[in-house]
Amino acid sequence: MSAEVIHQVEEALDTDEKEMLLFSCRDVAIDVVPPNVRDLLDILRERGKLSVGDLAELLYRVRRFDLLKRILKMDRKAVETHLLRNPHLVSDYRVLMAEIGEDLDKSDVSSLIFLMKDYMGRGKISKEKSFLDLVVELEKLNLVAPDQLDLLEKCLKNIHRIDLKTKIQKYKQSVQGAGTSYRNVLQAAIQKSFKDPSNNFRLHNGRSKEQRLKEQLGTQQEPVKKSIQESEAFLPQSVPEERYKMKSKPLGICLIIDCIGNETELLRDTFTSLGYEVQKFLHLSMHGISQILGQFACMPEHRDYDSFVCVLVSRGGSQSVYGVDQTHSGLPLHHIRRMFMGDSCPYLAGKPKIFFIQNYVVSEGQLEDSSLLEVDGPAMKNVEFKAQKRGLCTVHREADFFWSLCTADVSLLEWSHSSPSLYLQCLSQKLRQERKRPLLDLHIELNGYMYDWNSRVSAKEKYYVWLQHTLRKKLIPSYT
């Protein structure tokens, strides 16, 4: 997407439309707080996450069908067809909030802000703010989330907007029908991105500065079970957070596949100290990686363990890994995840599946021409066949994943061939020193460190970190 197109869109949108667009993308660019639409779209463009279809969806969400036709040469029906056939950039939860905001007049919003003072504090938000501003503040206090809409529903009932209360109830029913409960705004978006390889990495690139980090923590941390003294208001007492069971000995298998050769000892020591049985493989080909992953996905030993960890270090493309191969062929990252989904790997259903991937991205000009590997060989078929024999899994197939991907330019290996990845160094240090803290919290701080590093180095030396997760409980990465 060109800068010229982004400029045209930004110039054509009015203030309310810009606000709606920024709100709609809070799940997509959760690691940053863009001050304006131009910066938001530019960030997505730089990350390769602003396709024509993505921009068309955003214009559709703000109902600028004229811009669809004038700038993108698409009509409304074409976008609706695209949305029916493809995962959405904007989560259903964000769409719902935007629709409710459009249906509220100023007096309704003023009444809602007044009612929310019992929960937010008197000076938290001014009467001049919009409904979407109110939702953002409620998210920061963990009072509103994709699976936490009871308070908003109650307040809509109190202002006699039963029509909007009913709309929330219909949304809840649709989420329950999907069979998965998402705990925060990040996870609501992941449900979409997990289903389409072209949208694998819409989330979490690096970490913002400390001020921005604190601004985001409200929608990422667990509900607070104490009063907010700054506002002299009390939040409803929350049910204690449920944790994943992490008591088996060992905690599980930690599979290390290091196709570079710099990380094995560091990673082995780290995960052994956490209580994992470490199994390592060095310098595998693309097909070798696929075969090993397929074998480990089928291991019956998983039924006796409480979790699984996979650390993969390789050269690769933006959405695939090559192993030691030197062609355009690649093992798609979404195929790796698919091997361990609940229906393919039932012994790990309901248990956390933790992936840390360091991918050194190779430009296309450095490789021989070939096609992307489709994983339909013996390893993948074996996984699917065994899953069919065991029957359906009761836990949603995409649940319980923690997927951390770090990409860096392959030239880093040429400059410091024997040096380990900064991402994996920091990760190992945090896991060993702060093992009793939630993994999500550790990763947020890891992102902050990587952001600071990136601000001091050249483009070729930067590390870009993405996090996707569908965790349903708090995850402490050691014995609990």
Swiss-Prot record:
Residues 1-305 are annotated as: Interaction with CASP8 propeptide. Residues 263-358 are annotated as: Caspase. Disulfide bonds: none annotated. One of its GO terms (biological process) is proteolysis. SUPFAM superfamilies: Caspase-like, DEATH domain. It holds the Pfam family DED. The record marks D369, S370, D376, G377 as: Cleavage. Gene3D superfamilies: 3.40.50.1460, Death Domain, Fas (1.10.533.10). Residues 1-73, 92-170 form the DED domain. Residues 192-480 are annotated as: Interaction with TRAF1 and TRAF2. InterPro entries: Caspase-like_dom_sf, DEATH-like_dom_sf, DED_dom, Pept_C14_caspase, Pept_C14_p20, Pept_C14A. Residues 1-195, 370-480 are annotated as: Interaction with CASP8. Proteolytically processed by CASP8 generating subunit p43 and p12. GO terms for molecular function: cysteine-type endopeptidase activity. Residues 192-435 are annotated as: Interaction with CASP3. SMART domains: CASc, DED. Residues 1-227 are annotated as: Interaction with FADD. Residues 1-435 are annotated as: Not proteolytically processed and involved in apoptosis inhibition. Residues 217-480 are annotated as: Interaction with CASP8 subunits p18 and p10. Keywords: Apoptosis, Repeat. The caspase domain lacks the active site residues involved in catalysis. Belongs to the peptidase C14A family. TNFRSF6 stimulation triggers recruitment to the death-inducing signaling complex (DISC) formed by TNFRSF6, FADD and CASP8. A proteolytic fragment (p43) stays associated with the DISC. Interacts with RIPK1. Apoptosis regulator protein which may function as a crucial link between cell survival and cell death pathways in mammalian cells. Acts as an inhibitor of TNFRSF6 mediated apoptosis. A proteolytic fragment (p43) is likely retained in the death-inducing signaling complex (DISC) thereby blocking further recruitment and processing of caspase-8 at the complex. Full length and shorter isoforms have been shown either to induce apoptosis or to reduce TNFRSF-triggered apoptosis. Lacks enzymatic (caspase) activity. This is CASP8 and FADD-like apoptosis regulator. It comes from Pongo abelii (Sumatran orangutan). The gene is CFLAR.
